[in-house]
Amino acid sequence: TAFMITSVFSLGCSYFETYQMQQIRAMGTTADVAITSLSEEQYEELSRSSLVSVVGVSQRLGSIDTSGMDDALLSITWIDETEWQEHRVPTISDIHGDYPQAKNEIMLPTWALRAMGIDDPQIGMNISLSYQLGTDYQYISDEFVLSGYYTDYSASRAGNRGAAYVSELFATQTGLPFDSVSTAMI
């Protein structure tokens, strides 16, 4: 009887943990709240607040021209170290390489690489992309270096929508105002 009760509780706990992980992966973040159009002052206030345990920043800088990639939609996004480590890494797997550091580095989910025709990605390989920044709909063609790639589970929920991660240096050099592109992830 004790064995049976222990087995039922073990199975129940394992099922709950697995279900919870599936939900987190489908959402693509462990954050509970997103505050859009965040000002730098609001970010500082949230960071100092004892009511908030973790505040990450996500900046949607623009989008990639995905016209040759079926129905995929990719944003160009920069996230800070806190957002990456605390909110995003727990929701992805099979991480190869590192988060971008140099201006021309990019990190992509494997489903996006496959949509680009890249089935065997290599760290350091060049990837040519056209993208637009902010509300300027003029596309820029540029060459990026793949700094990393990973398995993303949220694309199936979001219908092949995802992010191409870029470096803080890239984000800074866009000149886009902080409050027009920033979201606090809590």
Regions found by a protein language model. Give the residues of each.
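Basic-flanked hydrophobic alpha-helices used for secretion and membrane insertion
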Residues: 7, 12-186
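Alpha-helical transmembrane segments of integral membrane proteins
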Residues: 1-4
